[in-house]
Amino acid sequence: MDVVVGMEARGFMFAGPVALSLGAGFVPVRKPGKLPGEVYSQSFVLEYGSETLTVHQDAVPPGSKVLIVDDVLATAGTVRATASLVEQLGAELVGVSVLLELSALGGREKLDRAGIGPVDVVLTV
């Protein structure tokens, strides 16, 4: 694992310590306007509206192995958008790790259909 990517804001709380324990770098994925310089952007739809995430264009060297870490997997919009950003960076997504999965919302199935995974979950409700 070269890099752990965490999404704003609660994902930062988990992704940073995971990166530290793996001896990997940490890359924040943020909402628009919060990162200076050139960024890649990816919009996605939530159950209550839409959102956009951004990452520095030079955040990850091409070919790096990337783990996405977030707090909750619900509809999978945030993870799918982040996976798209990882792809735009030219990196290899090797997995997704989340603390809590809300299984009734079907996020894991959406990730499976999109070919995103493997997905590791600490607790499913």
Q: Language-model segments: what does each one mean?
A:
Residues D2, S64, V94:
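Conserved acidic residues
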Residues V4, F26, V96:
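Residue-level signature of catalytic and energy-coupling elements of molecular machines
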Residues M1-E8:
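Short glycine-rich phosphate-binding loop at a beta-alpha junction
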Residues A81-V125:
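PRPP-dependent phosphoribosyltransferase catalytic core
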Residues G23-L67:
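Short, glycine/charge-rich flexible loops or terminal/linker lids adjacent to PRPP-binding catalytic cores
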Residues G6, I68-V69:
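Generic enzyme active-site microenvironment
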Residues D71, A76:
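Conserved G/P- and acidic residue-centered "switch" motifs that form tight phosphate/ATP-binding loops
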